[in-house]
């Protein structure tokens, strides 16, 4: 089994130049006045693919959203890419399917994955 955080972390590494970072939910700690008390730096775990491979995958996933199976996920005003998935549900009768989509934006400098 794979958790959503594991899937998201792995996917983000593919569009982040191949860099796999430890997942985190906090980037800094502030006081009541908004002053930074502590910055929480990202922790690089490893490289999953080369930057060249990452750049190629981003272009493929951009095409998926602009003219492929992920075109219904396109959001006007955003340069985004993504990956679609389809699986048959049991019983496999050719009617019941589970569909999925995971995406990122912007394509040139990904800031969001989900």
Predicted regions and their residues:
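Active-site beta-strand/loop architecture of penicillin-binding DD-peptidases
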Residues: 1-44, 52, 61-114
């Amino acid at each position: 089994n794979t958790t959503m955080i594991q899937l998201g972390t792995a996917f983000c590494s593919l569009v982040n130049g191949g860099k796999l970072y430890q997942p985190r939910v906090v980037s800094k700690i502030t006081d009541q006045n908004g002053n930074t008390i502590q910055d929480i730096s990202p922790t690089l775990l490893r490289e999953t693919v080369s930057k060249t491979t990452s750049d190629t995958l981003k272009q493929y996933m951009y095409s998926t959203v602009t003219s492929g199976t992920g075109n219904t996920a396109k959001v006007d005003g955003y340069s985004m890419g993504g990956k679609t998935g389809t699986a048959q549900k049991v019983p496999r009768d050719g009617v019941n399917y589970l569909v999925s989509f995971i995406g990122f934006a912007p394509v040139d400098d990904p800031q969001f994955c989900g």
